[in-house]
């Protein structure tokens, strides 16, 4: 993992240099396309550094700080709400009352956020039409099942792929769910998460 840390530090150094160049270009009133190119470079460096941070997190053991009585449906609603503000539709459907579990609230919120982002990337209509339906089902007294439907058929397992930023985050989301004693899988054009209610 040290090499990943070193790469991230190098990317951050390049970002500082690119930011310095952008300021000089802005002061010298250079053409707009040069400013745009530097902006894209900085955004790309940010994404690469973020991916490296996620890989570092994936390589470390998941340490949970569980709390009893966490309302899983509220954590999921909060994690998905930001996507509706960007125009991506995620529709929550709950077939049960509030579901409480003994979980790490913050790590579970991250996992749900990455699952929502992955669902939007893999939705049936990549052009943005159609919503992602998220259904919370209390399968038994001891576990809850959460499904993200409206996805297209994939030729790979998005939770084990590491093919790009979204898949890296889906792999980490699955690892967090598994650390809680649950599972995350892609089946029948759905993300299906099974989460125990007590640890």
Located regions from the model:
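Conserved C-terminal segment of the DHp
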Residues: 13-31
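Conserved DHp (HisKA) dimerization/phosphotransfer helix of two-component histidine kinases, i.e.
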Residues: 16-17, 34-89
């Amino acid at each position: 993992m040290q090499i990943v840390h070193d790469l991230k530090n190098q990317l951050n150094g390049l970002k500082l240099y690119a930011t310095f160049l952008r300021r000089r270009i802005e002061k010298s009133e250079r053409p707009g396309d040069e400013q745009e190119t530097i902006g894209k470079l900085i955004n790309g460096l940010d994404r690469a550094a973020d991916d490296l941070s996620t890989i570092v997190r994936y390589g470390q053991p998941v340490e949970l700080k569980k709390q009893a009585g966490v309302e899983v449906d509220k954590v999921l609603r909060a994690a998905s709400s930001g996507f509706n503000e960007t125009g991506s539709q995620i529709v929550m459907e709950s077939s049960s009352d509030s579901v409480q579990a003994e979980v790490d609230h913050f790590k579970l919120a991250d996992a749900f956020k990455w699952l929502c982002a992955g669902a939007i990337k893999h939705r049936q209509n990549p052009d943005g039409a159609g919503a992602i339906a998220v259904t919370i089902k209390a399968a038994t007294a001891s576990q809850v099942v959460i499904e993200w439907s409206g996805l297209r058929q994939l030729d790979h397992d998005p939770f084990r792929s590491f093919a790009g930023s979204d898949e890296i985050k889906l792999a980490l989301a699955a690892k967090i769910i598994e650390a809680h004693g649950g599972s995350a899988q892609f089946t029948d054009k759905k993300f299906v998460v099974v989460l125990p209610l007590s640890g």
